[in-house]
Structures are given as C-alpha cells and as structure tokens.
Amino acid sequence: MKNLYRYSCGEGKLDFVMLHGWGMNSNAWRYIINRFGSHFRLHLFDLPGYGFSQSEESFTLPEISETVLKKAPPQAIWLGWSMGGCIASEIALRYPERVLALITVCSSPCFVSQHQWPRISWQVLSCFEQKLEDHLQNTLEQFLLLQTLGTLNSQRDTTSLKSFLFSRPLPKKEVLKAGLKILRYTDMRDSLNAISVPFLRIYGKLDALVPCKIAELLDEAWPHTESVIMHQSAHVPFISHTDDFLEVILYFYQKYFSH
C-alpha cells in the first residue's frame, strides 16, 4: 500500500508507535500527543483503509502488520488500542527485533467469547456487520457510544470521538468488515505468552467492550507481563483520563528505559 498515512512528532529520543482501533483513525490520539511529545518521538498511523490511508481493499491481520511495519522506525515501543492491540501484538510476535516494548490499551488477545473467557459474543459482532450494509455512519456512531458507556463524562467523550472520526474520510464497508473478522477470529492467548520484551496491558474498569476481568486471567497466564486497571475509565482512557493515562505510560517507560 503506497498511501499509508503516518504522522511523526515529538522531541524524545525513543521512537513510540501508536495504533488506533476499529473504525477510528489516528486522530484518536489528539489529546495526548502534545504531552507525549516531550518524552518520545511519536509515530501515529492511520491503519490501511482508515482515515487518510484510504483503500478499496480489505486487509488481513498479517497484511496490516507488514504494511505498517514498512513505514515504522527500526525499533520502537509499540502501543495498540483495541484492535490496534492485536496488530501491535502480531508485530511483536513476528518481528520481535523491531519491538522494544509492547503496550496494549483496552485490548484482548481473544475478542470473542470462548469457554471460561469473558468477551463480546460473536452475535454482537455479527449485528455490527449486518448494520454496516445499510447504515455505515450510524453503526460507527453506535460503536463510539459503547466506548464511553458508564463514565462520568460519557457525552463529552463521545462528542470528542465523533469529531476525531469525522474529521477524516470514513473507512469503506469492506475494510470495516475485514476488521470485524480480525476481532472475531484472532486468538493470541497462547502465543503471546512467548513475548520476552516488557509488556504492559491497560484496562478500563467500566469498559463495555473489553471486560477488565481479563486482566486477572492474563496476570495468571502471563506472569511476566504487567497490567493496570483504570477504575473510572471505559474503552478510551487516553481521552477520558488523559493525565492518569500518561502517568501509567511514563511509569512503565521509566521502569525499563530511563537508565
């Protein structure tokens, strides 16, 4: 893909890649890039088919990972939010020499409910897929509402998300369907146990999409990783609780990279 959009900024010495979630674009990071920029050299991507990276094609998880990697710095901390966490994790597994550390935000190694595993039922994803056929914009707006559900400033944060989403071209239906397929079929619960770089998982206590009880299950399954639950947040802690989110990231950074 030739027109993959990347925006780089910041004065820090360490490269830091940020990947957005399903339906969104890299404008999602608008609230935090100024504060992160003094600590890191940020690289924000519109994933293939999203925002300014428009495409008629649909992409698989490996294809997205390889496309992004071609425009990424040689080594970086990789942060992925929601579906972006799947992509960052895929890159960490397949190209570990490119990843200094992995951070996933409100993400899951397995997004669809399995036996004794809390997640979205596949029927919910199927419902979104069906609605995309006739009501793409309304479906995306409904998804944004779910991301802030139950938080103190839900309406304000949903308004912010909408402004970020609609400030750039919307993804095509085929791209969104391919993204839902990634969410439905990806299962990295076993493979991510092999990650050897520092690995931080951030969750929102009020998240209606990624239940925070996943944190405890993965703490046990992946004892070499770390988790933080942000108790007043839902699916977008970097928007609803920007200062707290920055504090969590910087603590992790200083623990492993400040020597």
UniProtKB/Swiss-Prot annotation:
Instruction: Report the EC number(s), separated by commas if there are several.
Output: 3.1.1.85
Under SUPFAM superfamilies, the record lists: alpha/beta-Hydrolases
Per the record, the GO terms for biological process are: biotin biosynthetic process
Q: Where in the cell is it found?
A: Cytoplasm
- For this UniProt record, give its keywords in alphabetical order, as a comma-separated list: Biotin biosynthesis, Cytoplasm, Hydrolase, Serine esterase
- Locate the AB hydrolase-1 domain: which residues? 16-241
Q: Name one GO molecular function term.
A: pimelyl-[acyl-carrier protein] methyl ester esterase activity
Which residues hold substrate? Answer: W22, S82, M83, F143, L144, L145, L146, Q147, H235
Top-level EC class as recorded in UniProt: hydrolase
The superkingdom listed in its UniProt entry is Bacteria
Q: Where is the active site?
A: S82, D207, H235
**Signal peptide (residue range):** none
Functional description taken from the UniProt entry: The physiological role of BioH is to remove the methyl group introduced by BioC when the pimeloyl moiety is complete. It allows to synthesize pimeloyl-ACP via the fatty acid synthetic pathway through the hydrolysis of the ester bonds of pimeloyl-ACP esters.
Family membership, please give it.
Belongs to the AB hydrolase superfamily. Carboxylesterase BioH family.
UniProt subunit comment:
Monomer.
Q: What is this protein called?
A: Pimeloyl-[acyl-carrier protein] methyl ester esterase
Species annotation? Hamiltonella defensa subsp. Acyrthosiphon pisum (strain 5AT)
